[in-house]
């Protein structure tokens, strides 16, 4: 009987350690698996300073909220579309993000920021185009002359690299020669409002993405697990990170820094030097042509 009671007590203690629970200060604790994101760590600090009812702690073992949501079936996540509709409204989420994440009318991950590395082409060569088809790219590439590259790249698993093991091989010289070849596309980062503003004003490169595909991007998302004991509180945190109050934390990070909300994005863009109505329209055309990388 004593063993049975001890086992039951251990089970109850284990269950008590999972999911949302009261903190010593009376606030409900919500657990976040931030997937190693320093940006979200700073957002947690700001949220905890602002919230009187909830406190978020980082916990990978028994989370209520997860970043990314990879590895979780939709049946294990909360459909947050009703919360979106009664909150910021689905029309505020940038269409390409909503389209890429929506599943049969349900939304299991809220996009909070987006951006990333892409490929850009000279605005002069593009001559007003926003994207490049494969045929257009090949035509422009031919005009750059013999030996021109579509874009400079480097790989460690292709046969020609085997000469790196030859005594006479001079990697530095070969790399210098390789990267001095003319190329149609160059690496370009569009991951912050400042970088987007530069591109639509006086930037030399325009993000076309890969020819025939167009510009693609990554995004940072937050999901609520179905096992969460306080979905309302978890949604309060998601809304905080999505909204402008998390800006001081988000803008200190790297990677996905562009707001997922249209109102916030274009308001921030309009604050940048040199961005007029024409530049804003150009930015809208660019964002409307974006797609979410690896979207299901």
Residue ranges and their predicted role:
Residues 2-10:
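Sec-dependent signal peptide recognition
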Residues 102-185, 196, 226-232:
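Helix-loop-helix "hinge/cap" segment bordering the ligand-binding cleft or interdomain interface
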Residues 18, 220-295:
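Mature extracytoplasmic/periplasmic domains
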Residues 69-118:
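Hinge/lid segment of periplasmic solute-binding proteins
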Residues 40-44, 48, 77, 98, ...:
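Extracytoplasmic/secreted envelope proteins and their assembly/folding machinery
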Residues 45-53, 85, 102, 122, ...:
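Sec-exported extracytoplasmic/periplasmic mature domains
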Residues 174-248:
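Extracytoplasmic/periplasmic substrate-binding proteins
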Residues 1, 13-70:
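Conserved N-terminal structural module of periplasmic/extracytoplasmic solute-binding proteins
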């Amino acid at each position: 009987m004593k063993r049975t009671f001890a086992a039951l007590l251990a089970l109850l203690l284990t269950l008590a350690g999972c999911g949302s629970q009261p903190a010593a200060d009376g606030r409900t604790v919500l657990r976040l698996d931030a997937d190693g994101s320093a940006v979200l760590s700073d957002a947690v600090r700001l949220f905890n300073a602002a919230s009187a009812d909830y406190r978020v702690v980082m916990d990978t073992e028994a989370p209520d909220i997860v970043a990314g949501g990879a590895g979780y079936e939709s049946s294990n996540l909360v459909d947050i579309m009703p919360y979106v509709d009664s909150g910021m409204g689905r029309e505020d989420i940038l269409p390409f993000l909503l389209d890429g994440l929506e599943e049969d009318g349900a939304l299991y991950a809220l996009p909070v920021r987006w951006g990333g590395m892409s490929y850009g082409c000279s605005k002069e060569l593009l001559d007003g185009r926003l994207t490049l088809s494969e045929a257009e790219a090949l035509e422009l590439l031919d005009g750059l002359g013999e030996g021109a590259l579509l874009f400079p790249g480097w790989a460690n698993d292709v046969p020609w690299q085997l000469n790196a093991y030859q005594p006479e091989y001079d990697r530095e010289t070969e790399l210098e020669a390789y990267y001095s070849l003319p190329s149609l596309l160059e690496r370009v980062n569009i991951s912050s409002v400042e970088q987007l503003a530069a591109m639509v004003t006086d930037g030399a490169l325009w993000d076309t993405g890969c020819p025939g595909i167009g510009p693609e991007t990554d995004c940072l998302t937050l999901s609520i697990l179905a096992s969460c004991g306080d979905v309302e509180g978890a949604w309060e945190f998601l809304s905080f990170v999505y909204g402008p109050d998390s800006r001081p934390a988000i803008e200190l990070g790297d990677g996905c820094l562009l707001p997922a909300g249209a109102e916030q994005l274009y308001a921030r863009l309009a604050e940048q030097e040199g961005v007029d109505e024409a530049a804003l329209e150009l930015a809208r055309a660019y964002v409307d042509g974006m797609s979410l990388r690896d979207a299901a």
